[in-house]
Each structure stands twice: as C-alpha cells, then as structure tokens.
Amino acid sequence: LVGITYTELGSIGSYVSASAAQEAWKAQAVAIHSYLEYHKQYGSSANALIYTPVEDIPSSARSAIRKAVESVKDEVLTYNGSVIDAVWSASAGYNTQTGVYGTCSSLDAWGSDVPYLKSVESPYERQYHEKMRRIIGKDYDYVEYNDSRTGEPYQSADTTHKDLGGFVQYNTLVSNGRSYRYIGQFVSSRYCFDFSTDATGVPCMYYYGFGHGVGMSQCGAVGYAAEEGMGYRDILKHYYSGVSIRTVGSGTSSGGGLFGWLRRLLGM
C-alpha cells in the first residue's frame, strides 16, 4: 500500500478547483475509513498509512479538508454487507496492449481475485504522469548494459520479477536480441514505458505509474471530479466495483490513528 497524507492529495488537488478537490478528498476519506475498519475487523496491521501532523497543514488547506471530511467521516464502503479492503494508489498505470489508462485488478497484481477490485478505466492519469515519472539509469542503477549503440527501439520489457508487495524488483529490456537489466525497487507495479537515451548514450526507461495501481487512483479521482464534475460517491463506485456506501455509528471509530487525526483536524 502506498501511504498517503492529506497534504499529498491536496498538492494534486491544487491544480483544480476547490470544489473538485473536495470531492476527491471525500472519496479518499471514505476509502481510508473503510480500509482501517476492514483491517481492524480482521486483526491485521494498517501501519502503511502516513499521517501529517495537523499543525503542519496550512490553515487554508486545513479548512478545505475539514469541510470535505466532516460530511463523510462516518461513511464506509461495503460489499455484500461487509466493509471492504479499500486499497488505493497515487496513479494508475497504462495498458500498452489496449492503449487505455486504467487500474490493475487484485488478481493481476497479487494473484487474489477480489470481486470489488477489478480493472477499470482511469483516463485522467496522463496529465499527472510527468510529475511522477522516474528515469531508469538516473533514479535507479543499471547493470548488464554492454552495448553502446543508440537509436534502436526496445522490443520487450520483462516485469515479472516482483517482491511480495507486487513491486517490480528489476526489468530485463530486450532490443534486437540484446538484454539490458535495471535493478532497484520500482515505485509501481504497472506503468507506461517510454524509452530513450540520455546525452551520453545510456538508455533510459521512463515510467509514469505510481503505486500498485489497484483500487482508487488519486490522480484519477481528482480528474473525474474536475473534468466531469463527478461526486465522491460516483468516484468510489467507479473504482470499487459493486460496492455500497453506508453510515456507521461514531462508536466504531477509535481514538487513535486516522480517527484521532480527524478529531484534532475537526476540533472534535
């Protein structure tokens, strides 16, 4: 799980109107609440979540977040009556075979077929990808590069070598029968490839996804809100297939973690 802070989501939302950013914040708040409730019920850890101290959030952003979160703080996502494991990532990937931006299913990412974590389209990723790209050969080390010729297209990229979290550990790129291997834990398990060389002739592979790509895309949520005026409920139901949204009693919220954070933010 890629950790999230409300200020990180806010930095993406700053490129759109305040009303659109609020719908994305609402969607994120409901997803986080659902995720924590799910892991609390099943006794697993949710330590991957990252919280920003309330006092570190600018007052203007704090006010906007407070307004967005207040109305949804008791809502969770359910599937067949049970709260869901509402995972999310910063940005969805790109399917080079279909040419469509979209999320990754839990089956493709982790080998577990979860009915509400299907692959869905997420078209508003491209505008944020430049801000999140990583360059193999600069941001990561490369090894086994034994050919100095440039200008030859890469023919394939083997991304099957992953750790237990689903993140690619290294790639083997093939060009005209020669292999180039790059190592390092990539920050995405599904992404768009763009190949080129730097000024010295070293091949660089750009990729633009960020995170595991399963569940809601934060960039996609902002895009749907800004470009289509989509509300948080429709955003959530798009990214989590077949879910319902229900209100739970305030007694379900513990005093620590996200809920303590929200109480301090909301002045409760």
Task: Go through the PLM ranges and name each one.
Residues 1-268:
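Conserved, single-site charged/polar hotspot
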